[in-house]
């Protein structure tokens, strides 16, 4: 069976690949949206911390024999703690300044992190095997579904939904959102706003690290792997709407699928289709698809 001259298995394979990439886009843009929406900081270090999550996973297994499933928890925790240190020692001084200062500061953090790991490991890829439980594939009849890629999509959707629910539907999320609008009012309810801000940044970068762990068996691990991802992720955030949690999730997944299908029908445009969509969206709706017009 063919669709527009393309065999169905080939199209479904690219659709799945698009969903996997879209899962990474959604996870990373979600972390960026949390940080920008609640802290008003453009976190350019997100790509480097995504890379660091993958590198820590490789180091944990290579040097200590720590399995993938343990690193799925330990790596985000470690990067989250690093995020707390970054927020307390650097970012806290630029909250009242222009966005450009936050962008430049986090760019500097990116260059330091990438430079250190490039000096130690070089730029060649570090292999990381798929965990035994998720090796192989499942034959669905109409296509062969790689087990690990299916896991990436399911795990990403679960984390994205849990994050959206926490921020939009719980009392904690209400405090977080109110803290960005009127911190003094929130403090009057006994909430430690500076601590809340610190933990928010830590949580946002932990999401990037979680995506890095998921990516380790799929993308060759290298100190520069975040660079190839972060520009596209920023485009996703702009299209979805800066600071929009739901926009980041839906747009990330949607653009991943569009990118995957573009590779089937017009491969030459697959590297630019996301940015073409970004330009068109900004012309029609400058605040993004899910953003609020000011």
Task: Spell out what each predicted region is.
Residues 25, 29, 65-77, 201-208, ...:
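Transmembrane alpha-helical segments in multi-pass inner-membrane proteins
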Residues 21, 143-221, 245-251:
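Helix-loop-helix "hairpin" substructures at the membrane interface of multi-pass membrane proteins
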Residues 54-58, 76-82, 107-117, 155-164, ...:
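Hydrophobic core segments of alpha-helical transmembrane domains in multi-pass membrane transport
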Residues 65-109, 116, 250-251, 255, ...:
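Alpha-helical transmembrane segments within multi-pass membrane transporters and channels
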Residues 10, 89, 120, 181-188, ...:
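Cytosolic-side transmembrane-helix boundaries in multi-pass membrane proteins
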Residues 93-169, 196-199, 220, 261, ...:
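Transmembrane helix-bundle core of multi-pass membrane transporters
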Residues 1-27, 56, 67-71, 97-101, ...:
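Membrane-interfacial amphipathic/re-entrant helices at transmembrane-helix boundaries
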Residues 16, 38-85, 89:
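Membrane-embedded helix boundary and interhelical linker motif in transport proteins
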């Amino acid at each position: 069976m063919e669709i527009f001259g393309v065999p169905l298995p080939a199209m479904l394979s690219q659709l799945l690949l698009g969903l996997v990439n879209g899962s990474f886009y959604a996870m990373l843009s979600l972390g960026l949206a949390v940080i920008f929406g609640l802290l008003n900081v453009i976190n350019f270090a997100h790509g480097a911390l995504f890379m660091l999550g993958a590198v820590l996973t490789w180091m944990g297994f290579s040097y200590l024999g720590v399995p993938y499933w343990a690193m799925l928890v330990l790596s985000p925790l470690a990067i989250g703690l690093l995020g707390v240190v970054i927020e307390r020692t650097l970012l806290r001084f630029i909250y009242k300044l222009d966005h450009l200062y936050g962008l430049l500061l986090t760019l500097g953090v990116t260059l330091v992190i990438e430079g250190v790991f490039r000096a130690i490991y070089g730029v060649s890829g570090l292999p990381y095997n798929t965990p035994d439980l998720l090796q192989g594939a499942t034959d669905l009849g109409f296509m062969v579904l790689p087990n690990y890629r299916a896991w990436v999509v399911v795990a990403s959707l679960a984390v994205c939904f849990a994050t959206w629910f926490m921020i939009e539907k719980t009392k904690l999320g209400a405090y977080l959102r109110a803290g960005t609008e009127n911190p003094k009012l929130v403090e009057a309810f006994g909430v430690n706003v500076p601590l809340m801000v610190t933990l928010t940044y830590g949580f946002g970068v932990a999401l990037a690290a979680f995506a890095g762990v998921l990516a380790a068996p799929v993308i060759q691990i290298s100190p520069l792997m975040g660079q190839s991802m972060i520009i596209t992720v920023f485009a996703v955030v702009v299209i979805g709407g800066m600071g929009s949690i739901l926009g980041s999730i839906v747009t990330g997944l949607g653009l991943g699928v569009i990118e995957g299908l573009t590779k089937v029908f017009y491969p030459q445009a697959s590297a630019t289709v996301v940015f073409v969509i970004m330009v068109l969206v900004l012309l029609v709706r400058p605040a993004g698809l899910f953003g609020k017009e000011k």
